[in-house]
A protein has these predicted regions:
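Short, cationic-aromatic polyanion-contact patches
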Residues: 35-43, 59, 92-116
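Short, locally clustered residues in the helix-turn-helix/winged-helix DNA-binding domain
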Residues: 47-55
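Short acidic, hydrophobic short linear motifs in intrinsically disordered regions
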Residues: 55-66
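Short amphipathic alpha-helical interaction segments
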Residues: 68-83
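A short, conserved structural fragment
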Residues: 82-93
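Amphipathic alpha-helical dimerization/coiled-coil segments
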Residues: 109-141
């Protein structure tokens, strides 16, 4: 799965005290939520499951029940969160076979965000190498 994040110039939301409003705005800034989605949307509520219950290991079946939606919808939005690289996968034995679980890395969004920053740094370094290579190609003509 490829890492994906929208990077946009912004002002830190440190003056806001409503955690849901901060989360909603933040998720729109990074491209997880579209501009029209609100806190009652499935994508926001899915992210909120992880954010507000960081130690809980969620199975897809549990998320389906919690969000009152289909597995396909849960997986569609779960894959967007996984693309940010902030979730860790686990397994839980349930009957005959183990089922995957998901939770915020280290049970802490701030710590999980270090993975995002590392991926951004790597991507920017790779962009820089490509720009340098392109400039050399242009100058060689």
């Amino acid at each position: 799965m490829s890492f994906e994040l929208r990077v946009k110039k912004n002002t830190p939301l440190t003056g806001e005290t409503d955690s849901k409003l901060v989360a909603e705005t933040f998720l729109k800034l990074i491209g997880y939520l579209s501009s029209g989605e609100k806190v009652n949307s499935i994508p926001f509520r899915l992210f909120a499951c992880f954010l507000f219950h960081p130690q809980k290991e969620w199975m897809v079946d549990e998320l389906t029940i919690e969000l009152k939606t289909t597995k396909a919808t849960v997986y569609r939005h779960l894959n967007k969160i996984k693309a940010l690289d902030i979730l860790e996968e686990g397994k839980i034995d349930e009957g005959k076979k183990a089922k995957k679980t998901y939770k915020i890395r280290y049970g802490n969004l701030k710590k999980a965000w270090n993975f995002v920053e590392a991926n951004v740094e790597l991507a920017m370094n790779n962009y820089g190498e490509t720009v340098n290579h392109l400039q050399k190609l242009v100058e060689a003509k």
